[in-house]
Regions:
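Membrane-proximal helix-turn-helix segments that form the acceptor-binding/catalytic region
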Residues: 172-180
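Short glycine-rich or small-residue beta-strand-to-loop segments that form or flank ligand, phosphate
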Residues: 100, 184-185
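Well-ordered beta-strand positions
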Residues: 135, 182-183
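Structured helix-beta-strand junction loops
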Residues: 35, 180-181
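Nucleotide-state-sensitive switch-loop elements of NTP-binding domains
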Residues: 2-167, 171-172
């Protein structure tokens, strides 16, 4: 794969479930000022509810000039990571978008998503050849942050986990999401 002269800038939105990522994404899309934007929405469930909210949330994505990619039934930080690599590479090499927004699922850790951009495959190709990770945004539910931060609950006890072996606590995930962000909303 060749290195593109103009790399596709990418913003990744993370934050726990219900923090407002999809609301923020819709706000950004409604105020994009003629930029051609591609969007990847990741949801753990089989039915990508967040993608549906974006598609029908008044963002008016142009079907001919813009693209909404749904990545469902897994997490882009682990089980769908290879799919993320392929989708970002495809969108970047199409060379028709000004920006890429990625909304990760609420239980996703930002570090593995970001490291996807530095990963080099066996042929020496990397997403960093065609795309530039511009901003890592974490959306925080400020009304519940203190309560969640002092919680000892495991994600799986809340019905939210990456699988049976997921031993993360809610506070571990919140710390990962907040510490890795360069923008917190």
């Amino acid at each position: 794969m060749k290195v593109l002269e103009k790399k596709l800038p990418v913003t990744v939105l993370s934050g726990f479930l219900g923090a407002g990522k999809t609301t923020l994404l819709n706000h950004i899309l409604n105020n994009r000022e003629n930029l051609k934007v591609a969007v990847i929405v990741n949801d753990m469930s089989e039915v990508n509810i967040d993608a549906n909210l974006v598609e029908h949330g008044g963002s008016n994505l142009s079907q001919t000039e813009e693209k909404l990619v749904e990545m469902s039934n897994g997490c882009i930080c682990c089980t769908l990571r290879e799919d993320l690599l392929m989708q970002v590479r495809e969108l970047a090499t199409e060379d028709k978008f000004d920006y890429l927004l990625i909304e990760s699922t609420g239980i996703s850790e930002p570090l593995p998503v970001a490291s996807t951009f530095d990963f080099r495959d066996e042929d020496g190709n990397s997403l960093s050849d065609v795309a530039q990770l511009d901003t890592m945004v974490t959306v925080v539910d400020s009304a519940n942050l203190i309560r969640n931060y002092s919680s000892t609950d495991f994600l799986k006890d809340k019905g939210e986990s990456l699988g049976e072996d997921d031993e993360r606590t809610l506070v571990d995930l919140l710390v990962d999401q907040i510490e890795f962000a360069n923008v917190i909303l």
